[in-house]
Amino acid sequence: MENFSEWYHNILETAGIYDLRYPLKGCGVYLPYGFKIRRYAFEAIRDMLDESNHDEALFPMLIPEDLLAKEGEHIKGFEEEVYWVTHGGTTPLDVKLALRPTSETPIYHMMKLWIKVHTDLPIKIYQIVNSFRYETKHTRPLIRLREIMTFKEAHTAHSTSEEAEAQVQTALNIYKTFFDRMGVPTIVSQRPEWDKFPGADYTMAFDTIFPDGKTMQIGTVHNLGQHFAKTFELEFETPEGGKDYAYQTCYGISDRIIASIIALHGDEKGLILPPEVAPHQIIIIPLLFKGKEEIAMNKAKEIYKSLKNTYRVKLDDRDIRPGKKFNDWELKGAPIRIELGPRDIENNKLTIYRRDTGEKFQIDEDNLLNELNTLIDSIENTIKEKAEQKVKSFITILDNHDVNNIKETLSTKKGVVLVPYDENIYTEEFEEEIDASVLGTTEYDGKKYISIAKTY
């Protein structure tokens, strides 16, 4: 893919995913097809959180200025990016209201009211909402937005530091599983002190590598210790009758997972969607030969009815040429296409096309369900393997910390450069010298490295 940026912007439009033409920088519109991809992706993470004893909640979008400012270190991290509501109609407000940049302060304000004794803990809640950041950098659709239209944030409170640390590991495992299901390989790093989440003890982050060699952060997990709990007075009575503050964690993902699915699995023909998030997993296209139209259409409807309760299937009965239909669904990344014409029907055969490999082959109609089950699994595995190979090809390991060598490697090979961990060079000054981002410390093949990359 020679020009990834151009390809990416084109595919958002031509595949019907996202419309950039909304008259406000950094804001766009999820089109129906893109919205379905989003829906199925976030249904997966919602199910995983529900299964791990998280409860979904919903907090207000508006945050009073005095509440947002209560945690000074936290707000310093993004105070220049906050949108403010200053009027109600034409009347100036006594207290400005922030449009939710993130929800620690309102959620923890409410947690104070809910937590009294140790038996009130743990609390594990999440919400999937929009959030707002006045991005001053170059905005990119689904990558860097002023209105993040899909922000999944989870917040937990525990009675001991050990429980909070265990929750961090649980969150990391949930995200690892989720990204694997989406076919998105990641590099997990502990962010450096100067780049951790404001107010956190430490931050773990998931990055992936796009086809242009730049990395993008697609998920974070934070151990907050007791920092926010002390600020917001999340105090509880211990089993011994004493007092202690809650230990907290939070973790989030956003629309960037949709951008990653698009970027990592696409090709020059268009999208290649994992079956789990494909709006239509199977497309049925009848080949209508003159005088035999009814035969093919009736069989197509019969197959559609037999599959619709098992798969997300669409019968494309548009009055256009089959070749145009083929191109449309290859562009949109539908995993499987079933073609059938009069001759196929006579021979009890169906022609199958799989988008990920471009293979076309015939199967017996009587064995359709078994073939599809096997095929779905094969497509998911192949998509994952190809993405893993792409990302791995962008990882370079160096045995030294030479600044010029690192710069040259980033320029020629792009991607992520791993250098041996050395606390003496693990500094902001080193980051400035190499003119790239230090992602953090990364375990790779059993060794500890400093990971470095150009980022979005």
Curated annotation (Swiss-Prot):
<keyword id="KW-0436">Ligase</keyword>
<dbReference type="GO" id="GO:0005524">
    <property type="term" value="F:ATP binding"/>
</dbReference>
<dbReference type="Pfam" id="PF03129">
    <property type="entry name" value="HGTP_anticodon"/>
</dbReference>
<dbReference type="InterPro" id="IPR036621">
    <property type="entry name" value="Anticodon-bd_dom_sf"/>
</dbReference>
<dbReference type="InterPro" id="IPR045864">
    <property type="entry name" value="aa-tRNA-synth_II/BPL/LPL"/>
</dbReference>
<dbReference type="GO" id="GO:0005737">
    <property type="term" value="C:cytoplasm"/>
</dbReference>
<dbReference type="Pfam" id="PF09181">
    <property type="entry name" value="ProRS-C_2"/>
</dbReference>
<dbReference type="Pfam" id="PF00587">
    <property type="entry name" value="tRNA-synt_2b"/>
</dbReference>
<dbReference type="GO" id="GO:0017101">
    <property type="term" value="C:aminoacyl-tRNA synthetase multienzyme complex"/>
</dbReference>
<keyword id="KW-0963">Cytoplasm</keyword>
<dbReference type="InterPro" id="IPR017449">
    <property type="entry name" value="Pro-tRNA_synth_II"/>
</dbReference>
<dbReference type="InterPro" id="IPR015264">
    <property type="entry name" value="Pro-tRNA_synth_II_arc"/>
</dbReference>
<dbReference type="GO" id="GO:0006433">
    <property type="term" value="P:prolyl-tRNA aminoacylation"/>
</dbReference>
<keyword id="KW-0067">ATP-binding</keyword>
<keyword id="KW-0547">Nucleotide-binding</keyword>
<dbReference type="InterPro" id="IPR033721">
    <property type="entry name" value="ProRS_core_arch_euk"/>
</dbReference>
<keyword id="KW-0030">Aminoacyl-tRNA synthetase</keyword>
<dbReference type="InterPro" id="IPR004499">
    <property type="entry name" value="Pro-tRNA-ligase_IIa_arc-type"/>
</dbReference>
<keyword id="KW-0648">Protein biosynthesis</keyword>
<dbReference type="GO" id="GO:0004827">
    <property type="term" value="F:proline-tRNA ligase activity"/>
</dbReference>
<comment type="subunit">
    <text>Homodimer.</text>
</comment>
<comment type="similarity">
    <text>Belongs to the class-II aminoacyl-tRNA synthetase family. ProS type 3 subfamily.</text>
</comment>
<comment type="function">
    <text>Catalyzes the attachment of proline to tRNA(Pro) in a two-step reaction: proline is first activated by ATP to form Pro-AMP and then transferred to the acceptor end of tRNA(Pro).</text>
</comment>
<dbReference type="InterPro" id="IPR006195">
    <property type="entry name" value="aa-tRNA-synth_II"/>
</dbReference>
<dbReference type="InterPro" id="IPR002316">
    <property type="entry name" value="Pro-tRNA-ligase_IIa"/>
</dbReference>
<dbReference type="InterPro" id="IPR002314">
    <property type="entry name" value="aa-tRNA-synt_IIb"/>
</dbReference>
<dbReference type="InterPro" id="IPR004154">
    <property type="entry name" value="Anticodon-bd"/>
</dbReference>
<protein>
    <recommendedName>
        <fullName>Proline--tRNA ligase</fullName>
        <ecNumber>6.1.1.15</ecNumber>
    </recommendedName>
</protein>
